[in-house]
């Protein structure tokens, strides 16, 4: 176990086109096999599609989508005696942001459109309108936390 204390958070540089750290995080989530240029192409073309379809600033639409996906509660397993309880806990802001980006990319990959850029653009548009699989995932997470509210006193 390290004696130096907790590791420092890596400060992410904003992306070169939009100047946004959120877009840079999304590029890193889309990244597969270290092919960052392909991930950048996917994200930038998806944001161009969002701009064409909505006539709004694509980063603002992306942030609105992430706000609609971002969970405030989740359940964590806690073993007490012989039983394992699903204990609802509040989600820290950093983890909430990570979960929203992860769900956005995962459910984009699961969509049926032809290219990944189309899938990502449509998932962003759906999420910004409060629709889509990623928003449903957040609602399911909140329902699970609500259903297990009785075990909230096991929180740590």
Curated annotation (Swiss-Prot):
An annotated Gene Ontology molecular function: structural constituent of ribosome
Query: So what family is this one in?
Result: Belongs to the universal ribosomal protein uS7 family.
| Example GO BP | translation
Gene3D superfamilies, sorted? Ribosomal protein S7 domain
Q: What is the recorded function of this protein according to its Swiss-Prot or TrEMBL entry?
A: One of the primary rRNA binding proteins, it binds directly to 16S rRNA where it nucleates assembly of the head domain of the 30S subunit. Is located at the subunit interface close to the decoding center, probably blocks exit of the E-site tRNA.
Question: What are the annotated GO cellular component locations?
Answer: small ribosomal subunit
Q: Where is the signal peptide?
A: none
TM ranges are none
Supply the gene name: rpsG
What is the organism field in this record?
A: Bifidobacterium adolescentis (strain ATCC 15703 / DSM 20083 / NCTC 11814 / E194a)
Q: What is the protein name given in its UniProt record?
A: Small ribosomal subunit protein uS7
């Amino acid at each position: 176990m390290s004696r130096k204390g907790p590791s420092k958070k890596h400060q992410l540089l904003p992306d070169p086109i939009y100047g946004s750290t959120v877009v840079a995080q999304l590029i890193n989530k889309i990244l597969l096999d270290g092919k960052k240029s392909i991930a950048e192409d996917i994200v930038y073309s998806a944001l161009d599609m969002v701009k064409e379809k909505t006539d709004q600033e694509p980063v603002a639409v992306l942030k609105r989508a992430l706000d609609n996906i971002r969970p405030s509660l989740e359940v964590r397993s806690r073993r007490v005696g012989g039983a394992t309880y699903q204990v609802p806990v509040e989600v820290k802001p950093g983890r909430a942001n990570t979960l929203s980006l992860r769900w956005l990319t995962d459910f984009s990959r699961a969509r049926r459109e032809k290219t990944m850029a189309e899938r990502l653009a449509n998932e962003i548009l759906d999420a910004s309108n409060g629709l889509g699989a990623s928003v449903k995932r957040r609602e399911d997470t909140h329902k699970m936390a609500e259903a297990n509210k009785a075990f909230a006193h096991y929180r740590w």
